[in-house]
Every structure is written in structure tokens, then in C-alpha cells.
Amino acid sequence: MQKDLHPKAVPCKIIYQGQVVMETMSTRPEIHVDVWSGVHPFWTGEERFLDTEGRVDKFNKRFGDSYRRGSKK
């Protein structure tokens, strides 16, 4: 078997918006992330509501009853 085939694991800092949010082991000394669990709405419990009623109205306005009846061939 070959020696030193695998890269060495070193302490790694996970960086979010210029701040170290976590330390772990990796082959890279730093990893910059755009989103992490500390700010993601799913993990923080923050709810965001989409304007689904507006989407339905837009769909009905565009297609009307023709979608429900099916296409006539």
C-alpha cells in the first residue's frame, strides 16, 4: 500500500459573514458558507408566509375554468 495517500485532516473553521461559527476537522483550514443552521428559518423556527392566494388567483385568471374541465380534442 502507498503511504501518505490520503490528505491530512486539520482543524477547520466554518466562517459565516466573517465570524467563526463552528470548528471541526477537515482537509481545508477554512470553509466559508452562505447559510448555516443558526440562521436558516427551518432551524430557527422563524416562519415565512408565501402569498399563495395571489398565485392561485393569477393561475385562475390566466387559465380560468378550462383547466378544470380538461382539454377538448
From Swiss-Prot:
Keyword tRNA-binding on entry: yes
SUPFAM superfamilies per record: L28p-like (SSF143800)
GO BP, sorted A to Z: translation
InterPro entries documented for this protein: Ribosomal_bL28/bL31-like_sf, Ribosomal_bL31, Ribosomal_bL31_A, Ribosomal_bL31_sf
Entry-linked PROSITE patterns: RIBOSOMAL_L31
GO terms for MF: rRNA binding; structural constituent of ribosome; tRNA binding
Superkingdom as given in the UniProt entry: Bacteria
Gene Ontology CC annotation, any one: ribonucleoprotein complex
Keywords, alphabetical: Ribonucleoprotein, Ribosomal protein, RNA-binding, rRNA-binding, tRNA-binding
Assembly and binders: Part of the 50S ribosomal subunit. Contacts protein L9.
NCBIfam families in the cross-refs: L31 (TIGR00105), PRK00528.1 (NF001809)
Homology family: Belongs to the bacterial ribosomal protein bL31 family. Type A subfamily.
Purpose: Binds the 23S rRNA and interacts with the tRNA in the E site.
Name of this protein: Large ribosomal subunit protein bL31
Organism from which the protein derives: Deinococcus radiodurans (strain ATCC 13939 / DSM 20539 / JCM 16871 / CCUG 27074 / LMG 4051 / NBRC 15346 / NCIMB 9279 / VKM B-1422 / R1)
